[in-house]
Amino acid sequence: MTYVMSLFLLGLVLGLVAVASNPSPYFGALSLVGVAAFGCGVLIWHGGSFLSLVLFLIYLGGMLVVFAYSAALAAEPYPETLGSWPVVSVYFGYFFFVFGILYTNMVLDEEVWWGVSGEMDWDAVFRGDMDGVSLMYSSGGGVLLLGAWVLLLTLLVVLELVRGLGRGALRAV
C-alpha cells in the first residue's frame, strides 16, 4: 500500500514539474489534469473519497474555463510541446532540483521524515469527509450552488469573449 501512495505522490510531483516547465497552454492544461488526478488519488488513499470527488469535479470545471481562455489567447501555429528542447531542459532542471533536495535531506537527516503517522490510531476509524458532506448539504448548500453558478457564468463569459469570426472581444488582440 505504501508503493501505491508513493506512486501517487511521484505522479503529483512530476505533474507539478511539468506545469512549472511552461509548455504551451494546451499541454499545461493536460499536466494540470494529471496533477488533479494524482492529488485526488492521494486523498482517496487517505480515506477522503467524497472530498476528492468533489474537489476533482470542481477543479476540472474551473480548469475548463481557464483552458478555454488561455487556449483562445495563446493560439500558436507551432506550440511548445513537452518534448521540445527548451521545455525538456527546464523540466529536468526542476526534476533534479526537487529530487536533489530530497536526497540531501535523506543523507543529512538519516531518518525517515516522510513517513505517514497516525494511521493505526483511533483517528483512522472516523471519516472526516463524511462530516463535511453533512455540513455541505445542510448549511453549506447555498455556497455550493453559488460556486456552481459562478463557474457556469464564467464559462459563458469566456465562451462569449472568444467567439469566432471577429465578433468576440478578444479576437482583435
From Swiss-Prot:
Q: Name one Pfam family in it.
A: Oxidored_q3
Q: What organism is the protein native to?
A: Tetraodon nigroviridis
General function of this protein: Core subunit of the mitochondrial membrane respiratory chain NADH dehydrogenase (Complex I) that is believed to belong to the minimal assembly required for catalysis. Complex I functions in the transfer of electrons from NADH to the respiratory chain. The immediate electron acceptor for the enzyme is believed to be ubiquinone.
Q: Does the keyword Transcription regulation apply?
A: no
The record lists the catalysed reaction(s) as:
a ubiquinone + NADH + 5 H(+)(in) = a ubiquinol + NAD(+) + 4 H(+)(out)
Q: Which residues cross the membrane?
A: 1-21, 25-45, 53-73, 82-102, 142-162
Gene3D superfamilies reported for this sequence? NADH-ubiquinone/plastoquinone oxidoreductase chain 6, subunit NuoJ
Protein name, per record: NADH-ubiquinone oxidoreductase chain 6
Q: Which family does it belong to?
A: Belongs to the complex I subunit 6 family.
Q: Which GO terms describe its cellular component?
A: mitochondrial membrane
Location of the protein in the cell: Mitochondrion membrane
Q: Which UniProt keywords apply?
A: Electron transport, Membrane, Mitochondrion, NAD, Respiratory chain, Translocase, Transmembrane, Transmembrane helix, Transport, Ubiquinone
Which of the seven top EC classes does this enzyme belong to?
A: translocase
* Annotated membrane topology: Multi-pass membrane protein
